[in-house]
Amino acid sequence: MKTNYEIRYAAHPEDAKHYDTARIRRDFLIEKVFSDNEVNIVYSMYDRMVVGGARPVGEVLKLEAIEPLKAPYFLTRREMGIYNVGGPGVVKAGDAVFELDYKEALYLGSGDRVVTFESKDASNPAKFYFNSLTAHRNYPDRKVTKADAVVAEMGSLEGSNHRNINKMLVNQVLPTCQLQMGMTELAPGSVWNTMPAHVHSRRMEAYFYFEIPEEHAICHFMGEVDETRHVWMKGDQAVLSPEWSIHSAAATHNYTFIWGMGGENLDYGDQDFSLITDLK
């Protein structure tokens, strides 16, 4: 196995509005979340969020404590949320064993233990997408499925944004230090998410898009309300959203995305909305 990591530094909105396409993609887009028998990690300076992915194909992959953590174990001072977006898989955390099927999630609290990822079938490998944030205390590990989620049905087919927001790793379901994660599923014929747009300066966010055919693409919108930019994305890619940025998208096909947040509070509803007609 191999662990790859990179550090992404934070940007001031006054600087970011001058970025060209290549710079925007380099600083905010995470193109390769999954590689066979590798753990790919992006360590972001936005609230020190870690975004990563692991795809074990006939090997057991270990979550290593990358050098920037300066810790004996990855979870020594961190909590983590994991989603399986591939074939059936297994996550082991110390002596605990968790089987995760497609779209099932797992919360791991902080503590000194080895974490590993493996697939049940190498011909149908699991794909583990994860977010991690710093933690001031330990909370119990817990597997969470859509049956456990707080579900909000939003939008309409007429508005091209009919979707279910599955709030899964949130404080209405289980205790966390600052991590919140969920999964939004767009209905066939719907392509817009998070519109009207909003920001939450108390929290940064990361989006991971999947369940979109290879010949289609997602146009993710970011930036300040009066200085928006776009990032064209494919399935199985992620994007960082600074606390000052909107985060929305439209696509050429319906899709699903996993959102993860961290920062000042655990209030999902703490959002500052903008009128659609104010976007520039």
List where the protein language model places each region.
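A short secondary-structure junction signal
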Residues: G94, Y139-V144, L179-Q180, V191-A197, ...
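Hydrophobic, proline/glycine-rich low-complexity stretches
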Residues: M1-I66, K70-A71, L75, E79-M80, ...
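Double-stranded beta-helix
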Residues: A122-R163, I258-K280
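Short, conserved beta-strand element in jelly-roll/cupin
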Residues: L75-V90, E185-P188, H200-D226, W232
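Acidic, low-complexity central loop/insert segments
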Residues: G86-T134
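A short glycine-rich, His/Asp/Glu-containing loop-to-beta-strand
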Residues: V33-P68, H162-E205
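Conserved metal-binding segment of the jelly-roll/cupin
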Residues: L100-K120, W232-H253, G260-G262
